[in-house]
Amino acid sequence: MSTWTGKRVAVLYGGRSSEREVSLRTGAACADALRQKGHDVVLLDVDLEVAARLRAERVEVAFVALHGRFGEDGSIQGLLESMAIPYTGSGVLASAMGMDKTVSKAIFRSLGLAVADYRVFPRASAGSIGVGDLPFGLPCVVKPAGEGSSVGVHLVNEAAELGPACRDAASHAGDVIVERYVKGTEVDVAVLDGKALGAIEIVPANAFYDYAAKYTAGTTKYFYPARLPEAHVRAVMEAAEAAHRGIGCSGVTRVDFIVAGDGTPYILEVNTLPGMTATSLVPKIAAGLGLSFPDLCERILDGAALKA
């Protein structure tokens, strides 16, 4: 029997971030899965009245299915802490650090994890960034520091592409990060309660795993387990666990890497609230271990707690 059987569960989804549509899909899928397990579930689209709605619904535990700003950055976690409502996923500080790529990259380096060379630029200077500002040259990857789901991320191969890419990244949350492009195999690792579940290999139809490739069915191929030498898989899973611990995460995370030809796992980011849609990677990895989607959602729910 689940820890929260018989309790009123709110699945928090939607919200105001650029990842709202993905969150709506995640929340709907998770709510349906929890209902299949017999839980009393209410879906709440997070808005400025969410605190009053949580009280009105007499919510006893929250399943956080939000992505991006105001949901994955510690904001909703702080509200739930102040209302003494246990919730799934990471706490306020870990969520904030995981969301801010500038902060998380510094932490990864302090842990001894491999991080591709990068530069951070204020949003105000985005229009003046040139190739001469990049000691690692081209190709490079441009991204906003405070977004997820590859929102505002660009692969830049030519100098003429750099300015538009930086200006677009600056239109999103956070500073502009420009990092050296690492050629290799894209691999994501699911971590649940501090333990790596497995590593999945991602092969997009195009050269870059962007927003469309992530959320459009049929545009990307996945291989589980990842088609890498055993030693490389072991290294990437150990790095994922170290990143999960180093940020101070709880519950389930997805840690993204590029594994170079020599087996070095270059960490990209930790997703403290990974997608849980039909095309999402954590459910794919769990399914490969024989863990059904409803069982996975209940495992995540069982870990709900106050973290402050």
UniProtKB/Swiss-Prot annotation:
Main location: cytoplasm
GO CC entries: cytoplasm
Annotated Pfam families: Dala_Dala_lig_C (PF07478), Dala_Dala_lig_N (PF01820)
Keywords of this entry: ATP-binding, Cell shape, Cell wall biogenesis/degradation, Cytoplasm, Ligase, Magnesium, Manganese, Metal-binding, Nucleotide-binding, Peptidoglycan synthesis
EC number(s) on file: 6.3.2.4
Cofactor note: Binds 2 magnesium or manganese ions per subunit.
Signal peptide, first to last residue: none
Binding positions (Mg(2+) 2): E269, N271
Reactions accelerated catalytically: 2 D-alanine + ATP = D-alanyl-D-alanine + ADP + phosphate + H(+)
Pathway in which the depicted protein is active: Cell wall biogenesis; peptidoglycan biosynthesis
Job description of the protein: Cell wall formation.
Protein name: D-alanine--D-alanine ligase
